[in-house]
Amino acid sequence: MTDMPDATAPTPAIDSDHPAVVGFAAKHASSGRDPRERAVQLYYAVRDGIRYDPYSLVMTVPGLRASTTLEKGRAWCIPKAVLLAACCRAQGIPARLGFADVRNHLSTERLRRFMKTDVFYWHGYTSIRLGGRWIKATPAFNIELCEKLRIKPLDFDGRQDSIYHPFDLEGRRHMEYLRFHDEYDDVPVDEIMATFSKYYAGMVDQPLAGDFDADVEREAAAVEPAPRPSPRR
């Protein structure tokens, strides 16, 4: 694990001192009585206030900044994790970034063709220091997306790790965690870029064009609900 003497300080990507970040954090954590309650409030504000959009991938520090995500209102998993970490730090709650390689069984056809794999390398989450422990929080998928794709929304109570479920609400494979990386005080851009260049040829240089929300609507419409057992007579 990387040495992080102060997980509450701003960094180039986790710009927790930016006025927009400070204001967003103060607005959404205003009623929290302690760090745990404030962290939970911030989790839901980021999860549902910023729409998940993997087509918006930009692997530069300016593109990953928390303030940039607030300006755009949509982002993929890493900048959403960055935003949650920045909001926590703005509230004096220690937070850092964690990463895992996952096999994601639920994505759009356009994304699958573009990536040429169902493995998402360096999937981002936020690790928050609460009650003397580092707890994982994954604010990536907003509630509307979960409802459309029949995914159980990830809740966060500030006590237990919040990571993706292996199956969706229809019993289909959803997410498999293949490997957990280290946790970091800022985005390890060079390490992530090296992996992306190896496995996602051309994806970083030519961002994916398309409307993610529209693609999700089409995917959701094409999914047939799983058969329900017949009632006993």
What are these regions (language model features)?
Residues P54-W122:
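Active-site neighborhood of thiol-dependent amide/isopeptide-bond enzymes
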Residues Y44-A45, A86, A90, I128:
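Residue-level signal for well-ordered alpha-helical scaffold segments within enzymatic catalytic domains
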Residues T2-K72:
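Secondary-structure boundary elements
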Residues T2-D3, A9, A13-S16, P79, ...:
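His-Asp-centered catalytic microenvironments across diverse enzyme cores
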